[in-house]
Amino acid sequence: MKISIIIPVYNVEKYISQCLESAINQSLKDIEIIIVDDCGSDKSMDIAQEYAKNDSRIKIIKNSQNMGLFLTRCEGIKSATGEYILNLDSDDFLDLRACEIAYNATKNGYYDIVTFGSYYWNNNSASVFSEFERSSFDSGDEFGSWFFRSKNISWNIWGRLIKRDIYQANLDFLISINSRLIMAEDVLAMFVIYHNCQRLNFISDMLYYYRYNPSSSTNDKSIENLKNCIDNFEVVIAKMREFASKNQCDKRWQKLYISLGVHECDILKRRLKIKEGKFGLMDKIGAFIEGRWFVIRRKLRVKFGI
């Protein structure tokens, strides 16, 4: 089995058919499709069950209770048997040649991870979400130098093939977070996975469609959700620091990932203050200074590697 496609499912009945069609109709047929039911309340799983009846490559796992995207995805990865893992969110979809192109880019399993470009999909229109020039690295140190000086950092867990044995070897640490994450779960997973990858390939092909879903947790601007997102980032930042203290992580991207996590968390805290009507003059001044300093730091990092 070349690739295991992991699809966590929760209340996506409007989109799941397009997601599953894009997985089932891949030009590369040597794949398995693992659907993990996170106990939603709509007809998503009824639709998934119908597809499973007609395709033996589809395997369905049901959580005992709602666990959230992060732990649900981990449940699917536990059961995977493919050489590589491809994470696919159930409201997104793939180019029909995604698996074939990405697997060919592994060079017969030489690369631990292959990353490809993605589109942002909104109202049946595609725009670039992330894209890469072709770049390959034969050591973690070589990758670390390049990654640290990259202007735009991609930490999505989707849009990649990741060697299953590397992913599964780190599941215990990831699952030990024991928290129902709705935000920042990709940051933690990629922080750990990057540390354990030595050979990495970035390709220019645009193979993933990331859908704007107004009902998703990431687009929920309520006070309660903002508080949950802040809590999630704080948990993830603490977990990254814990992992770094126990492992010899590359200092450059360790610093980069954690500082970006803190920056994103600070943005959410400002949004919460604005929502609560507590964003005063000193907050505005602080936000302006922090924003300018963030831009300066990024320019120094990209241009001089510091």
Question: Model features per residue range: what roles?
Answer:
Residues 85:
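Short aromatic/hydrophobic "clamp" motif used to bind/position activated sugar donors
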Residues 30-39, 61-63, 90:
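Short beta-strand/loop segment that forms part of the nucleotide-sugar
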Residues 156, 202, 209-306:
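C-terminal subregions of glycosyltransferases and related glycan-biosynthesis enzymes
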Residues 63-80:
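Glycine-rich, basic loop-to-helix element that forms the pyrophosphate-binding segment
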Residues 142-222:
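Conserved nucleotide-sugar donor-binding catalytic segment
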Residues 97-130:
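Conserved donor NDP-sugar-binding/catalytic core segment of glycosyltransferases
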Residues 21-30:
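Short, acidic, metal-binding catalytic loop of nucleotide-sugar glycosyltransferases
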Residues 22, 37-46, 65:
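A conserved acidic beta->alpha catalytic loop
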